[in-house]
């Protein structure tokens, strides 16, 4: 890939388009902008631009297109697969200043936002207006465009679906700087190919998202959680298909193991309600009446006890809610704090294979003498599994990491699983995407990329590009 290097003349031209105080070069660019949350892939942009409008993005994309300069878009940088890392230098568009909630439409139940709005800010805003944005990824400081770019899911996906199900419309800037609208406030659309849905999950490789119209729901009046301990992960995960069949529909079904809970206790400095069992499922129920919620959780509680659960804890006090949900929210950071370096397997498998897959990771950890803690969304089969470096030397770490990842993704494929449930492919997981889908499937993806971005300027060498 032969791109133009950014020169002094380019910087001067860019500062004619964007105020100089929002254009950064060289040592002005902080180290954080060279990597994402996981930090295993590093590369600096040649110029960092903090954009504030669709029009500014359009101006920069036109300039980049005319001068053959690659462009990477970054939000909060909370990704885990290197998707926002500028492998070829070039321009980085940083969108966190585009953080306005533009409109709340209470008749159509939509909210229109700029790309840099944080998930936690969006959730707080709509809930203050008695409305509800269901997608609930664990990283609440992620931007909404980052969520859209990976089709993030989160804990509530088992009942409410994922980000794609809540994107009604997008404003995007194409590689050549053209601005187009995709979708809108409409509920139904059979008008040709759904370009909006191609953009969702494309990880910044097709265009730049500058505005989103999101679907909302009325806020449920009541929520309640259950924490249910089991003797082992096979029993805990094995109960999930039976819960789904029981006709009680939990908002969330999370699984967690004792060791991960202990990491969170150490990290947060406070105790979990119970950490004596080897495995747990955490369920949430919501609804508009106390009777509805109680009927559902009693059905599930009785089912779990009949299937070997050791107890059922109702998470109904402020103290217990804080203890349980702060721990669940801290699992990733707690595991990260327990080791010197780590990498993640964001695999998704059918619900009835979760227990087998986790048991496989236990056996793999023992065989390879590495720590492989995990947690995840049992309700939708999306597992978050971490290979920890600890005290391994660089050579041993690289060898063991590669082997562990290869074997886990290969096992997932035998279970009819896929490489990523919600964190995306980015740079780090490309070969596993190829293993899952094969060359013909990836050639179709590459053709879509070529149509949107004929000069291959947007986030090159990511997702389907080997």
UniProtKB/Swiss-Prot annotation:
Q: How does activity depend on temperature?
A: Optimum temperature is between 20 and 30 degrees Celsius.
Q: How is its activity regulated?
A: Activity is stimulated by divalent cations. Highest stimulation is observed with Ca(2+).
Query: Mainly localized where?
Result: cytoplasm
Q: Does the keyword Protease apply?
A: no
Q: Keywords in UniProt for this one?
A: Cytoplasm, FAD, Flavoprotein, NAD, Oxidoreductase
Q: Which InterPro entries match?
A: FAD-bd_oxidored_4_C, FAD-bd_PCMH, FAD-bd_PCMH-like_sf, FAD-bd_PCMH_sub2, FAD-linked_Oxase-like_C, FAD-linked_OxidoTrans_Type4, Oxid_FAD_bind_N, Vanillyl_alc_oxidase_C-sub2
Q: Kindly list the GO molecular function terms attached to this UniProt entry.
A: D-lactate dehydrogenase activity; FAD binding
Please list the reactions this protein catalyses.
Answer: lactate + 2 reduced [2Fe-2S]-[ferredoxin] + 2 NAD(+) = 2 oxidized [2Fe-2S]-[ferredoxin] + pyruvate + 2 NADH
Q: Which GO terms describe its cellular component?
A: cytoplasm
Is Magnesium tagged as a keyword? no
Q: Which cofactor does it need?
A: FAD
A Pfam family matched in the record: FAD-oxidase_C
Oligomer and partners: Part of the stable heterotrimeric lactate dehydrogenase-Etf complex, which is formed by the lactate dehydrogenase LctD and the electron-transferring flavoprotein (Etf) alpha (LctC) and beta (LctB) subunits.
The job of this chain, per UniProt, is described as: The lactate dehydrogenase-Etf complex catalyzes the oxidation of lactate to pyruvate. It uses flavin-based electron confurcation to drive endergonic lactate oxidation with NAD(+) as oxidant at the expense of simultaneous exergonic electron flow from reduced ferredoxin to NAD(+).
Mind telling me what this protein is named? Lactate dehydrogenase (NAD(+),ferredoxin) subunit LctD
Q: Which organism is it from?
A: Acetobacterium woodii (strain ATCC 29683 / DSM 1030 / JCM 2381 / KCTC 1655 / WB1)
Report the gene name. Answer: lctD
């Amino acid at each position: 890939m032969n791109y133009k290097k950014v020169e002094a003349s380019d910087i001067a031209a860019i500062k004619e388009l964007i105020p100089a105080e929002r254009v950064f070069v060289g040592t002005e660019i902080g180290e954080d902008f060279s990597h994402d949350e996981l930090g295993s892939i590093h590369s600096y942009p040649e110029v960092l631009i903090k954009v504030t409008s669709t029009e500014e993005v359009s101006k920069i994309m036109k300039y980049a297109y005319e001068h053959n300069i690659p462009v990477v878009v970054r939000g909060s940088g909370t990704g885990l697969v290197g998707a926002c890392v500028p492998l070829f230098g070039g321009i980085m568009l940083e969108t966190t200043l585009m953080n306005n909630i533009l409109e709340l439409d209470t008749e159509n139940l939509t909210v229109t936002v700029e790309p840099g709005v944080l998930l936690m800010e969006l959730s707080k805003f709509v809930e203050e207006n008695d409305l509800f944005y269901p997608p609930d990824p664990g990283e609440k400081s992620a931007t909404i465009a980052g969520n859209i770019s990976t089709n993030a899911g989160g804990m509530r996906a088992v009942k409410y679906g994922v980000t794609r199900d809540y994107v009604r419309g997008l404003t995007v800037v194409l590689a050549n700087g053209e601005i187009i609208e995709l979708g809108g406030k409409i509920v139904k659309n059979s008008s040709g190919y759904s370009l909006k849905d191609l953009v969702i999950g494309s990880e910044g490789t097709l265009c730049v998202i500058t505005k989103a119209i999101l679907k909302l729901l009325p806020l449920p009046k009541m929520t309640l959680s259950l924490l249910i301990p089991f003797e082992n992960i096979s029993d805990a995960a094995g109960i999930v298909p039976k819960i789904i069949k029981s006709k009680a529909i939990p908002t969330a079904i999370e699984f967690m193991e004792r060791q991960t809970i202990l990491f969170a206790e150490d990290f947060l400095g406070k105790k979990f309600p119970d950490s004596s069992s080897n495995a747990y499922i955490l369920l949430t129920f919501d609804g508009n009446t106390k009777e509805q919620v109680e009927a559902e959780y009693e059905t599930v509680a009785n089912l779990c006890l009949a299937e070997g659960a050791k107890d059922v804890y109702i998470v109904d006090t402020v103290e217990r809610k804080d203890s349980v949900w702060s721990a669940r929210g801290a699992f990733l950071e707690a595991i990260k704090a327990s080791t010197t370096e780590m990498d993640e397997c964001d695999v998704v498998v059918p619900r009835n294979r979760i227990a087998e897959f986790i048991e496989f990771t236990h056996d793999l950890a023992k065989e390879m003498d590495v720590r492989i803690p995990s947690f995840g969304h049992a309700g939708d089969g999306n597992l978050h599994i971490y290979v920890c470096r600890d005290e391994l030397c660089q050579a041993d770490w690289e060898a063991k990491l590669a082997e562990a990842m290869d074997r886990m993704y290969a096992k997932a494929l035998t279970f009819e699983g896929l490489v990523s449930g919600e964190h995306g492919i980015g740079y780090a997981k490309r070969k596993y995407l190829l293993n899952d889908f094969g060359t013909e499937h990836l050639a179709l993806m590459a053709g879509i990329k070529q149509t949107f971005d004929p000069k291959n300027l947007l986030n090159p060498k990511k997702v389907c590009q080997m």
